[in-house]
Amino acid sequence: MASYVICQFRKIMTEIRFKELGLIEYTETYDAMMQLIESQPSFHSIWSLEHYPVFTIGISEKEIIEDKLKTPPFIKTDRGGKTTFHAPGQQVFYFILNMKKLPFPPTELTKKSLETASSALASYDLKHNINARDPGIFIEKQKVASIGMRIKKNYSYHGLSINVETDLDTFNSIKPCGLNVQACNLKDYIDINVDNFKKDLLNNFQRMLTK
């Protein structure tokens, strides 16, 4: 885990801790987020990871029900949005951020996060667009990135997922996030080094939190 002080704003020294979790079960990560929030940290945390195959059901979902015995399992969660899919080859970023120390209103967190991810994609000359109504990033009307967050006790949790080279057959067995669209992978459009891409994203997220 990398941990260091990177900025000062509003006369408050704010630490951002980046943590690489690798391939990890969804429920294990969720429990770790809850434990961190209960500790009321003074710092921001951004976790980079991939999940074992799992469908997660958001609070807006009305059609799909939880079924932990299926393969992959369907797990009910408390994030915003509907149902999405996580699997290896999808880069996930969880934001456990102290809402009192953001350099922008908490209501702008989803918008700022999508714009930040979009700026990283723009460096690859990839044509894409942000959909504010159904939050995410789209390439040729196919969804490549999804976002869903929640705030509890003045902390955000959950976050952003970006399909790099994941299992689209399973993903597209549902309507991604309840939309009549297909999911897509970045590697279908651009040649991308995952480690460099993650580094670019984390640098952009750092700037997002220090403006």
Task: Locate each region found by the language model.
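Short conserved catalytic/interaction loops centered on acidic-Pro-aromatic/His motifs
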Residues: 128-130, 158, 169-174
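A hydrophobic, small-residue-rich beta->alpha segment in the mid-to-C-terminal subdomain
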Residues: 165-192, 198
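A residue-level signal for conserved active-site and pocket-lining positions in enzyme catalytic cores
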Residues: 33, 48, 186, 197, ...
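N-terminal lobe of the biotin/lipoate ligase/transferase fold
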Residues: 4-144
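Well-ordered alpha/beta subsegment
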Residues: 116, 120-124, 190-209
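A structural signal for short, well-ordered beta-strand segments
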Residues: 93-95, 135, 147-149, 160-164, ...
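Short, conserved beta-strand/beta-arch hydrophobic-aromatic motifs that form part
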Residues: 59-66, 73, 144-164, 168
